[in-house]
Amino acid sequence: MRINPTTSGPGVSTLEEKNLGRIAQIIGPVLDVAFPPGKMPNIYNALVVKGRDTVGQQINVTCEVQQLLGNNRVRAVAMSATDGLMRGMEVIDTGAPLSVPVGGATLGRIFNVLGEPVDNLGPVDTRTTSPIHRSAPAFIQLDTKLSIFETGIKVVDLLAPYRRGGKIGLFGGAGVGKTVLIMELINNIAKAHGGVSVFGGVGERTREGNDLYMEMKESGVINEQNIAESKVALVHGQMNEPPGARMRVGLTALTMAEYFRDVNEQDVLLFIDNIFRFVQAGSEVSALLGRMPSAVGYQPTLSTEMGSLQERITSTKEGSITSIQAVYVPADDLTDPAPATTFAHLDATTVLSRGLAAKGIYPAVDPLDSTSTMLQPRIVGEEHYEIAQRVKQTSQRYKELQDIIAILGLDELSEEDRLTVARARKIERFLSQPFFVAEVFTGSPGKYVGLAETIRGFQLILSGELDGLPEQAFYLVGNIDEATAKAMNLEVESKLKK
C-alpha cells in the first residue's frame, strides 16, 4: 500500500525528476514512445501525455506500458481516447503503475479506470492510493471456512448455493437476464449485508450503470445526504471506452475491494458485470500489440490474464471477498474459450437458459446445468441435499420424456411418468420468482424467500401433497403458501366465469 500525500491526480504520482519521452507512432489506442537511452520505463508503468491539440484544446491522456520494443522504444495502451495526439508530443513516465484512491473516501462515488470521480460530486481524497497491479495473497494467508451465503432466490439457494467468500459466475447469452439477476443480488445481499460492496461495470451499457446508480440512491445503499455513510463504491468502464480502459477497470474495482479486505479487515462483496468484456478487451489489445491470436481469435495469454485477476479475488484471514460475476456466453456456447476459462475459477455457476426465458420462467436459471461445490450433505445438511437431488432427478426425467411427449402426447406415458411430469412442471414453475428490481416492469411485488421456506415448498411438491393444485398456481410466487392461496383464487375465478 502506498500513501502519497502529493499526487497530481488519482491515477499518477508526482516525481521529483521527470523521465521524458516523445510519441513516435500512434495506431488507434496504441502509442509507441521513444525514451532516452537507459531511461526506459518498466512494464505496467503509467505514462502521461499532456499538451494541446491543433485547436488549442487541453489533452491529458494516461497510458500503460505493455511492451519494450528495443531501440529505446516502448509500446503503451491508452486508457482514454487518443484524439488530438500527435507524433513528437512529450510523454512523462510516472515511474509507477496506475494508482487509484482506496478506503472510505471511495464509498458512494463513481470512478473511471484511473480512479477519477465521474459523478460531478467534487474531488476525492487521494492521500491513500494503491497500485492496480499486485500479486495475489500467499497460500498461508488464505482462509478456508465453508458457509452458505443466502440470497433469497429459491432456485439459487436450493440447487446451486453460494459460498460466503467464494466466487460465483452468472452465465448466459444475450438478453436472458444476467444483469437483472445481478441487480437483484445487489438488492438482496448489499442491503442485508453489513459490510461494503464494490461494483465493477466492465464494458457494459452506460444506461444500466446509470439505472443502478439511481436505484442505489433510492434504496439508501448510497446515502445522498451523507456520502460517507454509503455502502458501495462504483467503478465504470463502459462499452464506448477504449479497450485499455475496459481491460483495466476490473483491476481498479478489485484494488478498492482488496483495501477494504486487507486494511479495514471487512467482508466485501465484489460485483463484476461483465467478466467476458474483460477478456474481449484483452483480445483487442493483444491484436493491437501484434500478438498471434489463439483459439477462436482470443489472445494467447487468456488463461494468464484471467488467472491474475481471479486469484486476487479470494478470502484471507483478515477479511473476505465474495464475488459475483456476470459472464456473457457468445452464441450460447458454453465451450467458448472465454466462459470455459472462467468456469475453472468458480465455486458456484448459475447458468441461465434461453429455453426457460422463452417460456417466461424468470429467473431463467437452468436447474440441471447450474452447479455448486457447496451442495454436499456435510455443508448444507442431509435434508437440503436430499430435496435438491430429488428436484434434479425429477427435472432430468421430465427432460428425457419431452421427446416422447412431443411425438406421442402425454396419454402414451405410464401413470408413474405422468405423475413425474406433472410434478416436474410444478417444480419448473415454482423455481420462478418475482424480483424486487423487476417490479417496475412486471407490476408484481418482489419476494425474498428464506432457505427453510424454499426447502419446505419443494418437499411438499415432491411428497405429492399438492398434486391436486393447478400448475399455474406455482408460477411467479414467493413461498408455497402463496401458491396454495393463488390456487384458491384461480378456483374462485373459474367458478365465477362459469
UniProtKB/Swiss-Prot annotation:
SUPFAM superfamilies: C-terminal domain of alpha and beta subunits of F1 ATP synthase, N-terminal domain of alpha and beta subunits of F1 ATP synthase, P-loop containing nucleoside triphosphate hydrolases. Keywords: ATP synthesis, ATP-binding, CF(1), Chloroplast, Hydrogen ion transport, Ion transport, Membrane, Nucleotide-binding, Plastid, Thylakoid, Translocase, Transport. It comes from Calycanthus floridus var. glaucus (Eastern sweetshrub). F-type ATPases have 2 components, CF(1) - the catalytic core - and CF(0) - the membrane proton channel. CF(1) has five subunits: alpha(3), beta(3), gamma(1), delta(1), epsilon(1). CF(0) has four main subunits: a(1), b(1), b'(1) and c(9-12). HAMAP family: ATP_synth_beta_bact. It is a peripheral membrane protein. Belongs to the ATPase alpha/beta chains family. The gene is atpB. It is found in: Plastid, Chloroplast thylakoid membrane. It is an enzyme of class 7 (translocase). PROSITE patterns: ATPASE_ALPHA_BETA. This is ATP synthase subunit beta, chloroplastic. It holds the Pfam family ATP-synt_ab_N. Produces ATP from ADP in the presence of a proton gradient across the membrane. The catalytic sites are hosted primarily by the beta subunits. Its EC number is 7.1.2.2. CDD domains: ATP-synt_F1_beta_C, ATP-synt_F1_beta_N, F1-ATPase_beta_CD. GO terms for molecular function: ATP binding; ATP hydrolysis activity; proton-transporting ATP synthase activity, rotational mechanism. ATP binds at G172, G173, A174, G175, V176, G177, K178, T179.
